[in-house]
């Protein structure tokens, strides 16, 4: 009897698939139900952000950063602001640093809540997202009360932050922290010991530490494999060196470890937030929130009403913008998804010559083939969920 030629089966996963997290298209080659090859097709959300930033002044480029990882927008602005501040060689006052750290940690919790609960939803649990989004809604209100926008904040500006926070808002953030631990415990009790969740995540998508470094992973992807690498500790920026917090580290490098790390990181973020709130209501209650050099940071409205110089500064800042000394700088922050870096090249004019964005999700997505090979088709969505990918930053 003649042998029949067995051909592998090709299917498209996405870009309309609910588990594809945005506009991802995966071309999967299957042998029965075993994944032989994964080919991610990206670029469906490409907007040419890096090129557009070259035609804008340094201040006008800030809103582009919000639209990258739009789940935790302020963390991206943070890296850009740090890069511009290094080129300008200016310092942010202590109160401004604390506000930045506070809102960066709010962004981290926003991101991890979305990821952990949708990861549970990807494998069939429908309750966690409802609980998670309830907390995210409260945090979105804190975003809104700080800068007027729920998502695209443009709140971190080079030199500091846009406006000071009212005491009432800081108190409300402080009141939110303790009940949040209860919510986390409820989520923990619901998902962590769940038999089905464990079966879908334990020993799935295992990454050894040397592989993680070789693929250019950062953030949770590296910590899940056993390295305590966190830019907030290893290369501290702002006032992170004064904060007390721990870095959770995994042992097995699988999807389940990465989930556990994200859960613990939310607790650590809440700890950092508590320290920031105490300082902002205590020792650092009064003080400037941005650099006082009016050649870079616009003067206050009150000054503009009675000072001609202030009005001229304001006009120059919002028409021409400030000129940044020629040079190049790389600034990175520990964004919720990993190391988000901004490589900024200045030619001495009022617009960036080149701004390269290093998105953590980009490096993680390229390893999809390496991670999924040999797994079942159903595991693809579990692995994708644990990578924590948002397409704004992958395609930019």
From Swiss-Prot:
Membrane topology type: Peripheral membrane protein
Q: Which InterPro entries match?
A: NADH_Q_OxRdtase_suD, NADH_UbQ_OxRdtase_49kDa_CS, NDH1_su_D/H, NiFe-Hase_large
**Could you tell me the EC number(s) of this protein?**
7.1.1.-
Single GO molecular-function term?
NAD binding
Q: Which cysteines are joined by disulfide bonds?
A: none
Q: Which UniProt keywords apply?
A: Cell inner membrane, Cell membrane, Membrane, NAD, Quinone, Translocase, Transport, Ubiquinone
Note the coiled coil stretches, chain numbering: none
Recorded superkingdom: Bacteria
Major location (coarse): membrane
Q: Where in the cell is it found?
A: Cell inner membrane
GO CC entries: plasma membrane
What reaction does this enzyme carry out catalytically?
A: a quinone + NADH + 5 H(+)(in) = a quinol + NAD(+) + 4 H(+)(out)
- Per the record's keyword annotation, is Aminoacyl-tRNA synthetase included, yes or no? no
What family is it from? Belongs to the complex I 49 kDa subunit family.
Q: How does it assemble?
A: NDH-1 is composed of 14 different subunits. Subunits NuoB, C, D, E, F, and G constitute the peripheral sector of the complex.
Job of this protein: NDH-1 shuttles electrons from NADH, via FMN and iron-sulfur (Fe-S) centers, to quinones in the respiratory chain. The immediate electron acceptor for the enzyme in this species is believed to be ubiquinone. Couples the redox reaction to proton translocation (for every two electrons transferred, four hydrogen ions are translocated across the cytoplasmic membrane), and thus conserves the redox energy in a proton gradient.
**Protein name per its UniProtKB record:** NADH-quinone oxidoreductase subunit D
- To which species is this protein native? Brucella suis biovar 1 (strain 1330)
């Amino acid at each position: 009897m003649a042998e029949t030629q067995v051909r592998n089966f090709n299917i498209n996963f996405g870009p309309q698939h609910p588990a594809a997290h945005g506009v991802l298209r995966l071309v999967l080659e299957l042998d029965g139900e075993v994944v032989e090859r994964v080919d991610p097709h990206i670029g469906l959300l490409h907007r040419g952000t890096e090129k557009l930033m070259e035609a804008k002044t340094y201040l006008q480029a800030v809103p582009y950063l919000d639209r990258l990882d739009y789940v935790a927008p302020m963390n991206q602005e943070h890296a850009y602001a740090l890069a511009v501040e290094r080129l300008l060689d200016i310092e942010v006052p202590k109160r401004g640093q604390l506000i930045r750290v506070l809102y960066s940690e709010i962004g981290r919790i926003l991101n991890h809540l979305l990821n952990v609960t949708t990861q549970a939803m990807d494998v069939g649990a429908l309750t966690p997202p409802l609980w998670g989004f309830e907390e995210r809604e409260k945090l979105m209100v804190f975003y809104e009360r700080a800068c007027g926008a729920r998502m695209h904040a443009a709140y971190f500006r080079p030199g500091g932050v846009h406006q000071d926070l009212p005491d009432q808002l800081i108190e409300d953030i402080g009141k939110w922290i303790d009940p949040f631990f209860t919510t986390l415990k409820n989520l923990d009790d619901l998902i962590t010991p769940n038999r089905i969740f464990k079966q879908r995540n334990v020993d799935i998508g295992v990454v050894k530490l040397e592989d993680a470094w070789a693929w250019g992973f950062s953030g949770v992807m590296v910590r899940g494999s056993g390295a305590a690498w966190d830019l907030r500790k290893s290369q501290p920026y702002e006032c992170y060196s004064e904060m007390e917090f721990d870095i959770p580290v995994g042992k097995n490098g699988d999807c389940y470890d990465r989930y556990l790390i994200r859960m613990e990181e939310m607790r650590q973020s809440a700890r950092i937030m508590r320290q920031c709130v105490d300082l902002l209501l205590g020792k650092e209650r009064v003080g400037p929130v941005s650099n006082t050099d009016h050649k870079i940071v616009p003067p206050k409205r009150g000054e503009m009403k009675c000072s001609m110089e202030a009005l001229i500064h304001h006009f120059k800042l919002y028409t021409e913008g400030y000129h940044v000394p020629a040079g190049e700088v790389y600034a990175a922050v520990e964004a919720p998804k990993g190391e988000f870096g901004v490589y900024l090249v200045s030619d001495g004019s009022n617009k960036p010559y080149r701004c390269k964005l290093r998105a953590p999700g980009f490096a993680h997505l390229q390893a999809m083939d390496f991670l999924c090979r040999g797994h079942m088709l159903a595991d693809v969505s579990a692995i994708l969920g644990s990578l924590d990918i948002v397409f704004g930053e992958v395609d930019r």
